[in-house]
Amino acid sequence: MRPSDDHGETSEFLPITRSRSVSAASQTSTDSSLSTESLFPGEQKPFPNVNGTMALADDDQYRDLEDGEVEQTEPFLASSKKAATGGGRARRIFWILVLLCLGGWLLAFALFLTGGRANYQTASDALQAHGADSALGSTSTSSGKPVTLQQVLAGQWNPRYHAIGWVAGPNNEDGLLVEKGGDEKQGYLRVDDIRSRKGNDTGRESRVLMWKPIVHVDGKAIVPSNVWPSPDLKKVLLISEQQKNWRHSFTGKYWVLDVDSQTAQPLDPSAPDGRVQLALWSPASDAVVFVRDNNLYLRRLSSDSVVVITKDGGENLFYGVPDWVYEEEVISGNSVTWWSNDAKYIAFFRTNETSVPEFPVQYYISRPSGKKPLPGLENYPDVREIKYPKPGAPNPVVDLQFYDVDKNEVFSVEVADDFADDDRIIIEVLWASEGKVLVRSTNRESDILKVYLIDTKSRTGKLVRSEDVAGLDGGWVEPSQSTRFIPADPNNGRPHDGYIDTVPYNGYDHLAYFSPLDSPNALMLTSGEWEVVDAPAAVDLQRGLVYFVGTREAPTQRHVYRVQLDGSNLKPLTDTSKPGYYDVSFSHGTGYALLTYKGPSIPWQAIIKTQGDEITYEDRIEDNAQLTKMVEAYALPTEIYQNVTVDGYTLQLVERRPPHFNPAKKYPVLFYLYGGPGSQTVDRKFTVDFQSYVASSLGYIVVTVDGRGTGFIGRKARCIVRGNLGFYEAHDQIATAKMWAAKSYVDETRMAIWGWSFGGFMTLKTLEQDAGQTFQYGMAVAPVTDWRFYDSIYTERYMHTPQHNPSGYDNSTITDMAALSESVRFLVMHGASDDNVHLQNTLVLIDKLDLSNVENYDLQFYPDSDHSIYFHNAHTMVYDRLSDWLVNAFNGEWHLIAKPVPDESMWERMKRSLPLLYP
């Protein structure tokens, strides 16, 4: 399960531009801390009891008629002749009375409308005055237009980022990068030397790999959607007609372009229209391994024929590509194929899904299967059967196999002390030298790690390291693919091969160096009450430097550091004197890097040159000038970063206050969360998202707190949630909300919480645990409601199997419908074709609500939408609904419809008001 990419960053190949000036964002950002020890709840003020009916006097003329009853009235016009002669005057009196009654009724109706809503302020208007709370920093003085939801959804607030493709030169030259998107004079696809861009004579000239963005094959125009140059830069692999499969996987038609002749041919000349799932260059640039119909093939460029590596792949057997659950929860990618460094071997997964149960996903509008229905069957939904293992059900059986390129032979290596087939998850494969490969595996519940060393030449293997993480701190092993091989170099003090891994150390995740490869003992490179992130980023083998990103300054920040390979002389490379959030991508030889500053001010990117302890800025390639202009023109919320202490744990929090915040007023508060294990929502990246829109345009306060279970606050706080998802996380949200409810500028009668995916689960779990005491409203999108319904690999990592932890699954399930009924109202939305968090979750919840006679909720489904809810304008609609629903909640509308009472029509009231009108 991954957080929804609601405000995803753009990352694209763009022509690199020269340096431009950049100004800081005008968002105000301050820091403070708050503890439960200083919490003094204020006087509780009950919400006005309004049910939407008009208070009427106990008078017969206003009572409702029983069914079939007719009121008796005297005739208005007498039958006598005397009465007839005075008809004109009587008519005038009649119409005067009618107009007076009608006017009185309209006045009463208007008073009802205004009076019934007088206690429900809209946005930040009509807020009650209270004393200011100045403990949390300054208020916003930014001016300008409010942020619009349309801007957020259209990505207008997304920073512009460049993804540079660093490549090694044919002779292992450093500082070369691939650029895509130039004009015909520059060439569409080029390899540039960063030194040449700065006018350095030592730089290589730019080399054009593709002159035009379109190539022709047998008279057919091929428009590639992505490109991959060969390591020797003499060929380019192209993909066209790309189609998405799952989150990371896709298929397409592949082509090989010759750089010198600018001509292309199909990857498989015998099947040019075949759809390929994966294609990877050989390190020797002389071959491409690819997957089609779940089988592996090898195309040597010296021949037009292809070599069949596997033959039995199909519906239940996958070779070289992951199945759904491995793609989503283990690899986070579309490839489980790895070339050895010398191009002599290929390692790949064989995934057997035969025993995995299927789950049907229905599509009512589209037909993603691509199959045309038979005549007469057009009105039936397209059904996609997914092999989806749920907790306790059979998992796919994954084996590591190898292919000897020269011998054209597939083989496996048996290893003693390996996990059983039904208890093995392979999380990483890393080639070393001389045909050796490191394999990291865990048991099914992901709390025992085993590292194996396999020798493909001798076809032997052994266990070299084992860690009982559950016994260490009750935690789990998070899958990652960041382990780095360190080759031996006696001249630089490395007599043996080794590798750098991330391991738990004194309660935090840190870098450890293992050498030789079969050593179980590590040299710790980092330590302290902070953590490394997806490390190492790069290793300078000549100078013995390890570069990495870490949270040493604060959990919400990311800075770039370097440390010697012996663990000494750790230093930051980025400016740590002020808050910052950086990312980095190093060149092949680590002499250069793309440094990306993501916040809190306006993001920028620069090419830097590394010189050991120092960095030199070579070229500013992006300063997001357009974003700077928008920041100056719009009123952004004030962001206040704080620490809160709950049960002795220090948690990270950000409060977004509306522009022109007035501490003398009372504001509604929306809590936003994700909260999944190891995740992080509170960080220092520049972000203008839905929460920013809520604060800027709607005038509400938005609070986000990363509770226990989230990442980068230490393993003690993270691992406590294992086996009981939702309990501590919800407790932390409620405890923090009580702190905010006690603040002088918060309207404690108007507090809501919302989230998507795991955040949707957390919204419902918080409402359930809170039972209306703190939060009155909630909005849950695509929520898990019972962890038995989610996939096995993710769930069992944090919950064990249902067989081992039945009570934990019972406790984490949304079951207390009476508690949910105590909130004023909540909203649930779900994509009907969600392949990740199945619609089953919401449907079972609705059944429980029905059985408990609970009606205080709204429900919305989106046909054919998956977990991201995008199909047919659904993404816009889901956020429109969130916005409107929230406004109605804080306006008090859901109180008005809580207990509906029939209301008389205007005509019926008029008739009883003037009984003489009707004989």
Curated annotation (Swiss-Prot):
Belongs to the peptidase S9B family. Coiled coil: none annotated. The active site is at S757, D834, H867. It comes from Neosartorya fischeri (strain ATCC 1020 / DSM 3700 / CBS 544.65 / FGSC A1164 / JCM 1740 / NRRL 181 / WB 181) (Aspergillus fischerianus). Keywords: Aminopeptidase, Glycoprotein, Hydrolase, Membrane, Protease, Serine protease, Signal-anchor, Transmembrane, Transmembrane helix, Vacuole. Residues 21-38 have a biased composition (Low complexity). The lineage of its organism: Eukaryota, Fungi, Dikarya, Ascomycota, Pezizomycotina. GO terms for molecular function: aminopeptidase activity; dipeptidyl-peptidase activity; serine-type peptidase activity. Type IV dipeptidyl-peptidase which removes N-terminal dipeptides sequentially from polypeptides having unsubstituted N-termini provided that the penultimate residue is proline. The chain crosses the membrane at residues 93-113. Its EC number is 3.4.14.5. Residues 114-919 are vacuolar. The keyword Transferase does not apply. The gene is dapB. This is Probable dipeptidyl-aminopeptidase B. Its main location: membrane. One of its GO terms (biological process) is proteolysis. It is found in: Vacuole membrane. Residues 1-50 are annotated as: Disordered. The keyword Membrane applies. Residues 1-10 have a biased composition (Basic and acidic residues). InterPro entries: AB_hydrolase_fold, Peptidase_S9_cat, Peptidase_S9B_N, Serine_Prot_S9B/DPPIV. GO terms for cellular component: fungal-type vacuole membrane; plasma membrane.
